[in-house]
């Protein structure tokens, strides 16, 4: 099947570059979000509390930690778990219990990102996540205790997977995926820190390895876990699906890099740690590839500074090389590559789920906006 060329990119991560409000719009099929939160607060958290019930006061701490931190990103991202499962699993497999288990996977994946986020906030000295103060700033014991909380919750997650999936055929594969998220996030973020000392903004070698680990390899497990829960254990199908959703991890990271400069803090839900700590990002590497000599020199003099005037000048330099347009080009090119990957998956149901997620991410406008545009065009 030939790759489709989208006429318009109006999806979730394209909106900020199109001067549209950065709506956190859900996938059109993500209609049971109330059940997601019910599972998080009435199944997972009580199970966690039960696991540590012998320790005075600790169950309540775990409850507060999870409730405050999870999800740490827009929970619509991890809909890939449910989308894959509901599209691929046979209808007779989709019992109420198996649907609940699917939501457990989704919420635990979000929790895994949240625990990695606690460590990330410590390294970046972050103050806010999703518009809320970070856990370390509100919990008893402060930063030191918060770090141990992240380790403890990650351990409880493994017990939760065993409790609910321990007898399933795909249990060992699920455990591997849940271990992958904190492990590869640690690798990627370490590379990210080390790369801050290298001011050669023309070399993207380390950045590619960092993003592969901290973004791609942490995002695709949510989708792959949904496929395993659907009963697909074929390594070839799992690998192909993982590759497709690995690209979504890259896209989320590039979107995050772009958002730091083209979204207000109220939209992004955080500050600007990349600029402050001289981090190499998609934005810096792409802009440097298009700067002339004078622009490159000025950029190096301004980037990494806390001076508001210099930070403002960085944004102006990005505008001079039309970083918005370069961002849209990157999204479009990535979409074409991923579409080709999807077309080679030898299972039409998996193809359908992958394509549906990518179209939400890049192509389809939010339903409310689509309806408004329809009225205006008629």
From Swiss-Prot:
The reaction(s) this protein catalyses: (2Z,6E)-farnesyl diphosphate = (Z)-alpha-bisabolene + diphosphate
EC identifiers of the protein: 2.5.1.-
Tissues expressing this chain: Highly expressed in male epidermal tissue associated with the cuticle of ventral sternites.
Binding site for Mg(2+) 2: 120, 124
Cofactor: Mg(2+)
Function description: Sesquiterpene alcohol synthase that catalyzes the formation of the pheromone precursor (Z)-alpha-bisabolene from (2Z,6E)-farnesyl diphosphate.
Protein name: IDS-type sesquiterpene synthase
Organism whose genome encodes this protein: Nezara viridula
Gene name of the encoded protein: TPS
């Amino acid at each position: 099947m030939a790759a489709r060329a989208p006429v318009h990119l109006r999806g979730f991560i394209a909106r900020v570059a199109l001067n549209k409000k950065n709506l956190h719009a859900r996938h059109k099929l993500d209609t049971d979000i109330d059940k997601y939160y019910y599972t998080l607060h009435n199944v997972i958290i009580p199970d966690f509390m039960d696991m540590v019930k012998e320790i005075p006061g600790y169950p309540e701490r775990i409850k507060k930690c999870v409730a405050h931190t999870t999800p740490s990103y827009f929970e619509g991202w991890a809909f890939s778990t449910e989308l894959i499962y509901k599209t691929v699993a046979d209808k007779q497999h989709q019992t109420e219990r198996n649907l609940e288990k699917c939501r457990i996977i989704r919420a635990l994946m979000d929790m895994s990102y949240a625990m990695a986020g606690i460590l990330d906030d410590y390294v970046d000295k972050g103050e806010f996540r999703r518009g809320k103060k970070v856990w370390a700033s509100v919990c008893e014991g402060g930063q030191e205790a918060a770090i141990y909380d992240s380790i403890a919750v990650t351990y409880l997650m493994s017990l939760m997977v065993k409790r609910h999936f321990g007898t399933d055929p795909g249990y060992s594969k699920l455990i591997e995926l849940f271990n992958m998220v904190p492990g590869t996030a640690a690798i990627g973020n370490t590379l990210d820190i080390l790369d801050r000392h290298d001011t050669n903004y023309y070399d993207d070698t380390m950045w590619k390895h960092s993003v592969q680990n901290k973004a791609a390899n942490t995002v695709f497990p949510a989708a792959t876990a949904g496929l395993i829960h659907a009963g697909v254990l074929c390594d070839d199908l799992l690998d192909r699906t993982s590759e497709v959703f690995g690209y979504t991890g890259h896209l989320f990271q590039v979107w995050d890099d772009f958002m730091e400069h083209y979204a207000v803090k109220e939209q992004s839900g955080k500050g600007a740690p990349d600029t402050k700590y001289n981090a190499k990002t998609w934005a810096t590497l792409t802009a440097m590839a298009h700067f002339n000599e004078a622009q490159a020199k000025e950029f190096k003099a301004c980037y990494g500074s806390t001076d508001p005037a210099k930070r403002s000048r960085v944004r102006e330099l990005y505008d001079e090389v039309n970083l918005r347009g370069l961002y849209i080009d990157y999204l479009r090119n990535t979409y074409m590559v991923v579409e080709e990957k999807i077309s080679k998956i030898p299972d039409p149901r998996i193809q359908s789920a992958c394509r549906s997620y990518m179209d939400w991410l890049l192509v389809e406008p939010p339903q409310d906006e689509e309806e408004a545009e329809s009225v205006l065009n008629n």
